[in-house]
From Swiss-Prot:
Name of encoding gene: hmp
Reductase: region residues: 151-397
Protein name: Flavohemoprotein
Cofactor remark from the record: Binds 1 heme b (iron(II)-protoporphyrin IX) group per subunit. Binds 1 FAD per subunit.
Annotated S-S bridges: none
Function: Is involved in NO detoxification in an aerobic process, termed nitric oxide dioxygenase (NOD) reaction that utilizes O(2) and NAD(P)H to convert NO to nitrate, which protects the bacterium from various noxious nitrogen compounds. Therefore, plays a central role in the inducible response to nitrosative stress.
Cofactor annotation: heme b; FAD
One of the GO BP terms on file: response to toxic substance
Species, as recorded: Xylella fastidiosa (strain 9a5c)
Origin organism lineage: Bacteria, Pseudomonadati, Pseudomonadota, Gammaproteobacteria, Lysobacterales
Record comment regarding domains: Consists of two distinct domains; an N-terminal heme-containing oxygen-binding domain and a C-terminal reductase domain with binding sites for FAD and NAD(P)H.
Superkingdom of source: Bacteria
Amino acid sequence: MSASFSPHTITLIKSTVPLLAEHGTTIIEAMYHRLFEDPQIEALFNQANQKNGTQIHALAGAILAYARNIDNPGVLASAIERIAQKHVGYAIHPEHYPHVATALLGAIKKVLGDVATSEVLEAWGEAYWFIANLLKDREAVIREGIMTKNGGWIHWRRFVISKRIPESETITSFMLHPEDGGPVVPHQAGQYLTFRFDAAGMPGMKRNYSISCGPNSDHYRITVKREHGTGASAFLHDQAKVGTIIECTPPVGDFFLPSVIERPIVLLSGGVGLTPMVSMMEQIAEAHPDAQVWYVHGTQNRETHAMDAHIRALVSRHKHMKATTFYTQRREADDAEAGFITIDWLRANTPFQKADFYLCGPRPFLRTFVRDLIGAGVPAVQVHYEFFGPMDEEMAA
């Protein structure tokens, strides 16, 4: 990913870095205010992340990082891929980009005032369209890849909840079949679906849920923790029944198992972060009999431990798969380690520097293990992670 920005453009963009550091969130707030004057544009965004401010801070941080690296945008390649995948999930299309450009440049002018000269705005317009064109091109490739597969679709598709499976005190799985009776595009183990809940009386509410079953052309399974409040998880747990219709876009995401497994694999999860790991384990059990796999999971206790019996069954089917669970509230009769997963334990009980690590869990869990694994000598290219929510900074930072 190389850009041919002129030295003058680079100088102008970098001159705004101190101002973006100070006023970035104000600029993004003003940008969204302009965008959301159009209800059709507003509906594209996850309004929960708007209300709690996480998306505003995330985008402000991303724009600041872009400005700081305007002379070397290649360092943002992984972020570009994640954004493109997310845009496909949220059904964002090329025709939406001009609206963002107008709102962003207008917000920069409004907040920075006279500092935002015509030259500065022209430089930021050039920088915006460079990234926008990269995203549009990548999103087109992702969509084409989906549509060329049997069962592929674009936009929103209606699915029927065909089964509810209680997994723990707070976690339930939902089996989903397409209402139209057609096939579904097989996902890559680790990917997620994006749901909208307009029909449930929550317009603008969108959520990403990992697929927790192995790839197939018949159905998807999602496994959802009941969170506090009245959002999407509350609707699924308290109101959605067998026969309820929910809508989603096709599977996306850059966190998935490779088609060829060349190194030992360590799957590391905390809480409901186990969901993509179960999908990966099902895929490994089905298609990779010689893969060396260590699954390490942490949760509070037996009552919060979801899908334990299913995971044990998968391990029993695969001669090279091991699973260890840590309970922070372990009782004497529990078949689990006590306390928290540690780097020292992983170093002593897994291939460590020789392995590919796949991580999913709460933000503190991810931040700790991404940082500590790399700090302990695991190459960064062997540490893969999934996080749901705006990525306001790299986990290793």
